[in-house]
Amino acid sequence: MASAISLSLLNGATPLKSNSLHKSRLTPLHLRTISCSRLSYSPSSREISLKTQSTVPISCRRSRFDFVPRCGISSNDLPTEKKKSFGEWVEFVGEAVSTAFPIWVSLGCLLGLMRPSTFNWVTPNWTIVGLTITMLGMGMTLTLDDLRGALSMPKELFAGFLLQYSVMPLSAFFVSKLLNLPPHYAAGLILVGCCPGGTASNIVTYIARGNVALSVLMTAASTVSAVIMTPLLTAKLAKQYITVDALGLLMSTLQVVLLPVLAGAFLNQYFKKLVKFVSPVMPPIAVGTVAILCGYAIGQNASAILMSGKQVVLASCLLHISGFLFGYLFSRILGIDVASSRTISIEVGMQNSVLGVVLATQHFGNPLTAVPCAVSSVCHSILGSVLAGIWRRSAPKQLED
C-alpha cells in the first residue's frame, strides 16, 4: 500500500491525507473507534473511506497525532510509554524523599527521643562532614546566572536579607523572655534565630507557588553572609545567657558553610557533567543528614526533653510562626508582589537549624543548647509544609495570568 493514504468522511468533510494529519495535530484520544465493517478500500484510488456520521472535533487541531498505517493495527492503538532509565528512577526517588522532608526529620527526632542509643555512632566530626556535604550540594545548584539574577530583583533580595537577620533574631530573643526559658534553651533558640535560611525552603517555596529563583538567591545570600551575621548576632543577643565564642563560631561557619557552597558553585560552573551525575542523589543525602543530626541532638538530651520538652516545642513554634507572619506582612507593606512575598515569608520562617545543631555542639558547653535547634528543624518543616499546602490552593495573580 502506498505511503500516502487518505481518510474520507462521507458527511461531506474534505478527505484528510496522512501528511495533513500531522498539520491538524490529531490525537488518538479524539478519534472514535472504527469498525472494520465500516471501512471500504478502493485499489484504484488507494483510498480508505469511513462510513460514519461523526466529524473530527475542533480540539483535535491542538494535539499532535502521528498516523502510521500498519496492517492489523486499529486506530485506537496507542504507542507504549517509554520506560524510565536508571538515572530517571534515581531522580524520581530523590524528589519523593525530598518532598517528604518533614516526615524523615520527625522520625529521626522521634527515634532519638525513644531510642537514644540509635545515634551513639554519631560523633561531632561526623556532624561537620554531614553538614559540609549538604552545603556542597546546595552550592551545586548555583551558577553565575543566579548571581546575575540577583541584580534584576535587588529590592526583594535586600528586603529578604534584612527581614532574615532582624525578624528571626529579635523574635527568638523576645520569645525567650516571654516564656522565661532556662539559659541553655534561650541561647539555643537565639542561635536558631541567627542562622541563615534553610535549604528545605526552596522545596517549600516551589510547593507554595512562590518565586523559586528568589528563594535560591535568598538562601545563598543569607548562607554566605552567615559567616559574619550568625556569630555577630548570637554573641550580641545570647551573651547574657552563656559565654559565646564569636571567633570560633565564625571559623566554623566559614568551614561548614561558605567554603562548601563556593566549591559547589565552582563545580557547577566548570564540571557540569560531574554535577549532573551526582546532583540527583544530593537532596536525599541532605535530608538523611538533617534527620540524623536532629535525632542525634534529641538523643543526647532525651531525658531532659521528656521533662521540659513542651516548653521548647512551644518556643520553637512561636519563633517560626512569627517568622512566617512578619516576613509576609512586611514584604507586602514594602510593595513586593504576592509570589515574592510568599518566598520571603518562607525564607524568613525556615532556618538552617542543622547549622545551629553543629555550632551548639562544637562551641557551647551545655549539650542542652542544641535541643532547640533540633526541635526547630521539625517545627519549621511541619509549619512550612502546612503553609505551602494552604498557599498552593490559591495561585498568585501573576502566575494565573
Swiss-Prot record:
Protein location: Membrane; Plastid, Chloroplast envelope
TM stretches of this protein: 92-112, 122-142, 156-176, 187-207, 212-232, 247-267, 278-298, 311-331, 371-391
Membrane topology, record value: Multi-pass membrane protein
Pfam name, any one: SBF
Domain of life: Eukaryota
UniProt keyword terms in alphabetical order: Chloroplast, Membrane, Plastid, Transit peptide, Transmembrane, Transmembrane helix, Transport
Function: May function as sodium-coupled metabolite transporter across the chloroplast envelope.
Name this polypeptide is given: Probable sodium/metabolite cotransporter BASS1, chloroplastic
Encoding gene, per UniProt annotation: BASS1
